[in-house]
Curated annotation (Swiss-Prot):
The keyword rRNA-binding applies. Binds directly to 23S ribosomal RNA and is necessary for the in vitro assembly process of the 50S ribosomal subunit. It is not involved in the protein synthesizing functions of that subunit. This is Large ribosomal subunit protein bL20. GO terms for biological process: ribosomal large subunit assembly; translation. GO terms for molecular function: rRNA binding; structural constituent of ribosome. GO terms for cellular component: ribonucleoprotein complex; ribosome. Transmembrane segments: none annotated. It holds the Pfam family Ribosomal_L20. Keywords: Ribonucleoprotein, Ribosomal protein, RNA-binding, rRNA-binding. The keyword rRNA-binding applies. Belongs to the bacterial ribosomal protein bL20 family. InterPro entries: Ribosomal_bL20, RIBOSOMAL_L20_CS, Ribosomal_protein_bL20_C.
Amino acid sequence: MARVKRGVTSHAKHKKVLKAAKGYYGRRKNTIRIAKQAVEKGLQYAYRDRKNKKRTFRALWIQRLNAAVREHGLTYSRFINALAKSGIEVDRKALSELAIHEPAAFAAVVEKAKSALPKAA
């Protein structure tokens, strides 16, 4: 059986890691042992933050909606409750975009939702 030398394989692996570490600071970009750790940690952060991104954007949409709805005399929580009662099934992202780019349409949605709320005494 022929002898297997791993020079080509390990060189390719090292190249792959160093390519991923491109742009890192200090020895993290050119020392394989340190670069490997840095790339691994970077991938962990990327995985974690793909999940966090969803939370962050939802929070942003809610903040925007809260600000937009308060201009119409409601709070965010009462607005969402009113939407549910009036049977309007539009997600927070779409409502947020509507509030920014189509204020008139958003105002109509708010008025429709307000009509589902009980009148204050």
